[in-house]
């Protein structure tokens, strides 16, 4: 049994579409359930879920309200309420390809050594086009973009599955614990780090997570996510979360993260120079803004 966990907060515009894409896939409805966790929605999300249930009576959907605000609280509630031995997290503002659930099910069934997996995350810009200032690094930050080719295998380097397209065996959380509720998004605040925290724990336990190119998720990107205010709040949230995450582990972990930040600044300066001499200064300037906001918050300023 697969449990698809969708944590949602005020996504009336998108929730029907993501549910519909799961329902109309190639994986049989009796082999999965949808665990929907409402994290105190104030819009018509519930009404849209009711509409989906009326239109798709063969799909098992269980609806829960998590009153503790925050994505990590909602994710943990999803784990506790799930009945499946495979837990798949799907973003509430996305859609998935028809073979999405079948891809995960087939891989876990034939590879018992795999503890977790994730697939590509492809942005869908509601504005119709990608901004000219977008770089690969900013794209990953703002849209969750993730693509490592068309062959399955271990995630390269220090990469790990995106939180909105990740599948786990339930035993993972029995081993490493639940999401850290001090990290992650909370209402309209844009913290993060809870996914990295989980995968860092998995690495320390020697667990395996695999990239599956056929488990594709399409992430809707509204125009406001491309504006300066959102960018500044998101990058500041990353720095704050990294500070909290590493200090929680210990001072040595925090110092190591500061050294990593210094190396990232060196790379940022090199890229800024590259974009300057190739007459694309907007891209370089955005990278500098990103790094500056993260560093400032990482230092607690």
Residue positions per predicted region:
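Short, well-formed alpha-helical segments that are part of the catalytic scaffolds
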Residues: 11-25
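Glycine-rich, basic loop-to-helix element that forms the pyrophosphate-binding segment
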Residues: 66-82, 103
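Short aromatic/hydrophobic "clamp" motif used to bind/position activated sugar donors
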Residues: 87
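Conserved donor NDP-sugar-binding/catalytic core segment of glycosyltransferases
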Residues: 99-133
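Short, flexible, basic/aromatic active-site loop/helix in glycosyltransferases
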Residues: 137-159
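A short, conserved alpha-helix in the catalytic core of glycosyltransferases
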Residues: 163-168, 172-176, 183-215
């Amino acid at each position: 049994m697969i449990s698809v966990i969708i944590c949602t907060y005020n996504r009336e515009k998108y929730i029907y579409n993501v549910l519909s894409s799961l329902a109309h896939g190639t994986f049989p409805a009796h082999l999965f359930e949808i665990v929907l966790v409402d994290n105190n929605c104030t819009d018509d999300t519930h009404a849209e879920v009711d509409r989906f249930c009326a239109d798709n009576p063969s799909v098992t959907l269980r609806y829960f309200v998590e009153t503790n605000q925050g994505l990590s609280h909602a994710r943990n509630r999803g784990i506790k309420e799930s009945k499946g031995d495979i837990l798949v997290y799907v973003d509430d503002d996305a859609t998935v390809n028809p073979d999405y659930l079948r891809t995960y099910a087939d891989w876990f069934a034939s590879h018992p050594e795999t503890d977790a997996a994730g697939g590509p995350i492809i942005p869908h810009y509601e504005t119709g086009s990608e901004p000219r200032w977008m770089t690969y690094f900013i794209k990953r930050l703002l849209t969750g973009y993730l693509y490592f080719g068309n062959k399955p295998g271990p995630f390269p380097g220090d990469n790990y599955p995106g939180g909105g397209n990740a599948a786990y065996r339930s035993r993972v959380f029995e081993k490493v614990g639940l999401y850290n509720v001090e990290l992650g998004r909370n209402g309209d605040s844009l913290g993060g780090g809870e996914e990295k925290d989980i995968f860092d724990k998995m690495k320390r336990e020697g667990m395996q997570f695999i990239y599956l190119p056929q488990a594709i998720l399409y992430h809707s990107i509204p125009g406001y996510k491309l504006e300066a205010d959102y960018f500044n709040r998101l990058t500041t949230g990353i720095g704050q979360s990294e500070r909290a995450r590493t200090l929680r582990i210990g001072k040595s972990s925090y110092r190591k993260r500061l050294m990593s930040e210094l190396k990232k600044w060196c790379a940022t300066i090199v890229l800024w120079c590259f974009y300057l001499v190739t007459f694309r200064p907007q891209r370089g300037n955005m990278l500098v803004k990103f790094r500056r906001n993260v560093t400032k918050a990482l230092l607690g300023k």
